[in-house]
Amino acid sequence: MSLISRLRAVVAGDDFLDSDFDELDYETSDDFENFNRGKKEGSTEMATISQANPFDGRSGFPPSNVIGMPGISTNDSEVSLMEPRSFDEMPRVIQALRERKTVILNLTMMEPDQAQRAVDFVAGGTFAIDGHQERVGESIFLFAPSCVTVTNSFQEEASPSNMSNKGNDLISKETSPAPEPAWGETVATAL
């Protein structure tokens, strides 16, 4: 029977659609009594089953179906040094970052405006994968994926304890604490 003929039958009020439904057998009180008797007899079996932890018996499952991400589980790290001559080579840098490789990008061979465009492009890709970026030198940059931690040891070497006396005098003048703002005192007294 097609959909259109069924719709016509419903609109016309024909009762032959009632034959399309199956008759359901409802449980009687006898069925419930048999169920309750079986429940009382099997209550000790149910108690032992409910006390057992279903998560203890994992021997039937394979040890692990998880596949690690490339570059994270291996101890081999790769650093790529790239010296592009044009912006057209920048997608290779992004691909290396996606493969979890650290990239040192030497842009001294490019024109300054193209180099700026390249750095912006790769910095955006690095940001998209939660990576890190550092400027190493003039037109030389380090881009690393999120699985690599980048630390800057230059800041440790340039600390005030490692500098000469001239540097210490300069730094002590520059790092003197700033005076409190005038509005800070009135707010503090008001509280």
Curated annotation (Swiss-Prot):
Record localization: Cytoplasm
Xref: Pfam families: SepF
GO cellular component term of the entry, any: cytoplasm
Gene3D superfamilies, alphabetized: SepF-like protein (3.30.110.150)
Coiled-coil annotated residue ranges, if any: none
Domain of life: Bacteria
Function comment: Cell division protein that is part of the divisome complex and is recruited early to the Z-ring. Probably stimulates Z-ring formation, perhaps through the cross-linking of FtsZ protofilaments. Its function overlaps with FtsA.
Family: Belongs to the SepF family.
Protein's recorded name: Cell division protein SepF
